[in-house]
Design a protein with these regions (language model features):
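Surface-exposed, charged secondary-structure patches
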Residues: 62-124
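Short beta-strand edge/turn micro-motifs at domain boundaries
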Residues: 116-147
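Short, exposed beta-strand/loop patches in secreted or surface proteins that constitute
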Residues: 36, 100-103, 130-132
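Short, well-ordered alpha-helical segments enriched in acidic and aromatic residues
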Residues: 40-58
Length: 147
């Protein structure tokens, strides 16, 4: 009987933890989507994890975030990393001041599809950002010098 109670307790706790993570993901995605659509640069930039990051790359990330501000977000979701994503995330990349690496290990990727319509027609754009967790919060890690 005691072992049955222990097993049920473990299942209940792990179910609650999974639900909390799902709620955390939904909250992050909604916050990011709202910030994109309302040109909220402060919120967008608060999602960047810049500790140890290359300052030129931080500037580039900020510019890229503001590049699509105000566009209609037609799809935004956190996805699991594929094997190719993991390989790409862990490999050193060429940066403005040498080889750079992500300063946090990504756990997911944020996929954003935006639509833009104007007098010249319409277009869609898809962007992907690696997402990591730091202090219980989802962040976009900005690359810095490899260690």
């Amino acid at each position: 009987m005691k072992s049955l109670l222990v097993i049920l307790s473990i299942l209940l706790i792990s179910g609650l933890c999974a639900r909390a993570t799902t709620e955390q993901e939904k909250t992050f995605v909604e916050k990011y989507k709202t910030a994109l659509e309302t040109n909220d640069t402060t919120t967008l930039q608060s999602c960047l994890y810049t500790t140890g990051a290359d300052p030129m790359i931080v500037g580039f990330y900020k510019m890229m975030q503001s590049n699509g501000e105000g566009d209609k977000v037609s799809k935004i979701e956190l996805e699991e990393l594929t094997l190719d994503d993991v390989k790409k995330a862990t490999a050193p990349q060429d940066g403005p001041s040498g080889k750079v690496c992500l300063n946090l290990k990504p756990t997911k990727k944020l996929v954003i599809v935006t639509e833009k319509k104007d007098e010249n027609g319409s277009s869609t754009n898809t962007t992907e950002n690696f997402i990591a967790e730091k202090d219980g919060k989802f962040v976009i890690p900005v690359p810095g010098p490899c260690k």
